[in-house]
A protein has these predicted regions:
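Hydrophobic structural segments
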Residues: 1-111
Length: 111
C-alpha cells in the first residue's frame, strides 16, 4: 500500500452572505476564513454565487409582472457582482495569502 503524503483539513462554509452587499459579504468571508484557518483548515470552500448572494428570489417573482421590483433587485445584483479587473476580491486574496491557505468562493462576475 502506498504511503500517504499527509492529510489536509477542508472547511465547507455554510453561512449566509450579506445578500446584495459585496463589501459586507467579503468582510464576513474574511472572518469565516480566519475562523476556519485557525481550526486547521487548509482549503476553505464557499457556496455557489456566495458573493453577493444566490438570487433565490427569481423563483418567487411572477413571470411577466413585478417589473419595478425585478428591475431594482437585478440592478443591485449587478452593482454588487464581482469585477475581477477592479480587484473586488482583494480582501479574500489577502486573507488567503496571509494565512497560507486556499479559498474557493462562488461569485457573480461582471466585466
Amino acid at each position: 500500500m502506498p504511503k500517504r503524503a499527509g492529510t489536509h483539513k477542508v472547511a465547507v462554509i455554510q453561512h449566509p452572505p450579506v445578500t446584495l452587499d459585496r463589501r459586507k459579504t467579503l468582510e464576513r468571508g474574511v472572518e469565516l476564513i480566519e475562523k476556519a484557518a485557525s481550526a486547521g483548515a487548509r482549503l476553505i470552500s464557499f457556496p455557489e454565487t456566495w458573493v453577493p448572494g444566490y438570487p433565490e428570489w427569481m423563483w418567487r417573482l411572477r413571470p411577466g409582472g413585478d417589473y419595478k421590483l425585478t428591475g431594482e433587485i437585478h440592478r443591485r445584483l449587478i452593482e454588487n457582482s464581482v469585477d475581477l479587473k477592479a480587484g473586488d476580491l482583494k480582501l479574500i486574496q489577502a486573507a488567503a495569502r496571509r494565512l497560507k491557505i486556499t479559498v474557493s468562493i462562488g461569485v457573480h462576475e461582471r466585466d
